[in-house]
């Protein structure tokens, strides 16, 4: 791996001022070069870590914003290998953790061991396969341990105590909490069930908790911080800025920087 060495999630959480701000983007949306500049802008605006989605033709867990981003990236010619090349270029200017959010079919198609080997080579810190339950993750867990990559799983409001215990046993890095049931997208408020879920997961295990799906406003970040979340993952709100400014790259980057700065500040310890 060339470029900066990846910071661990543990170190990132130690360094974060309050609630960590972690933006999500789709690799190659709307094209490789613009995607790189978007990520650079997010890092410059204070992102504590990055979540990068690899575009997929049938993203079942994602709402219209991320589906649109996937489609733009695929139309721009993005492949799994080009996504890894993008990560390598990001590693040239930042050491913050980079997590992948992918569908297991992409991993399976390349071969589990080869996917994780290539991810480690590119500088990936953690991998979350959105449609991979822990009960079926033995190959992924083996590869993650082999290549020193954190394997992350989704925890939802419907996750029972026994399943949460199992997830806690095999996860590393952090727990990814789904803030609302259903697909991703910017929501207007934080549900009470999300706050209760944060408390339940924090009581169960020792891993930090990051909340995604629907986080889009400064007040969301403050509420989640106050409920005990260690970080927030913001995707659809940022992707909406991308899709709304495709004709003006400079304005797009300016608005992304402004949004990221506002959300980062909202999570501060005060």
UniProtKB/Swiss-Prot annotation:
Domain of life: Archaea
PROSITE patterns recorded: TRP_SYNTHASE_ALPHA
Pfam family, one: Trp_syntA
InterPro entries membership: Aldolase_TIM (IPR013785), RibuloseP-bd_barrel (IPR011060), Trp_synthase_alpha_AS (IPR018204), Trp_synthase_suA (IPR002028)
Biological or metabolic pathway of the protein: Amino-acid biosynthesis; L-tryptophan biosynthesis; L-tryptophan from chorismate: step 5/5
Active site: 51, 62
Molecular function as annotated in GO: tryptophan synthase activity
Single GO cellular component term: cytosol
Gene3D superfamilies from the UniProt entry: Aldolase class I
Broad EC category: lyase
PANTHER family, per the entry: TRYPTOPHAN SYNTHASE ALPHA CHAIN, CHLOROPLASTIC, TRYPTOPHAN SYNTHASE, ALPHA CHAIN
Family designation: Belongs to the TrpA family.
Primary role: The alpha subunit is responsible for the aldol cleavage of indoleglycerol phosphate to indole and glyceraldehyde 3-phosphate.
Subunit structure: Tetramer of two alpha and two beta chains.
NCBIfam families named in the record: trpA
Protein's name according to its UniProt entry: Tryptophan synthase alpha chain
Organism for this UniProt entry: Methanothermobacter thermautotrophicus (strain ATCC 29096 / DSM 1053 / JCM 10044 / NBRC 100330 / Delta H)
């Amino acid at each position: 791996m060339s470029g900066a060495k990846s910071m661990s999630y543990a170190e990132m959480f130690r360094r974060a001022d309050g609630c960590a701000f972690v933006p999500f983007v789709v690799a190659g949306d709307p094209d490789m070069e613009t995607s790189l500049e978007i990520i650079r802008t997010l890092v410059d605006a204070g992102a504590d870590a990055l979540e990068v989605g690899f575009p997929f033709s049938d993203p079942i867990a994602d709402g219209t914003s991320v589906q649109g981003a996937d489609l733009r990236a695929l139309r721009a010619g993005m492949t799994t290998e080009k996504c890894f090349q993008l990560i390598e270029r990001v590693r040239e200017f930042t050491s913050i953790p980079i997590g992948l959010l992918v569908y297991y079919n992409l991993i399976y198609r390349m071969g589990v061991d080869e996917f994780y080997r290539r991810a480690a080579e590119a500088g990936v810190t953690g991998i979350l396969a959105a449609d991979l339950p822990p009960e079926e993750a033995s190959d992924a867990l083996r590869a993650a341990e082999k290549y020193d990559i954190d394997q992350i799983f989704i925890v939802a409001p419907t996750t029972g105590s026994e399943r949460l215990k199992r997830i806690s046993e095999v996860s590393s890095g952090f727990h990814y909490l789904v803030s609302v049931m259903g697909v991703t997208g910017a929501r207007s408020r934080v549900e009470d069930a999300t706050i209760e879920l944060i408390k339940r997961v924090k009581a169960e295990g020792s891993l930090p908790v990051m909340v995604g799906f629907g986080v889009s406003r400064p007040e969301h970040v403050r509420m989640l911080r106050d409920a005990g979340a260690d970080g927030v993952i913001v995707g659809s709100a940022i992707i909406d800025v991308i899709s709304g400014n495709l004709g003006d790259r400079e304005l797009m980057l300016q608005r992304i920087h402004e949004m990221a700065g506002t959300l980062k500040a909202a999570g501060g310890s005060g």
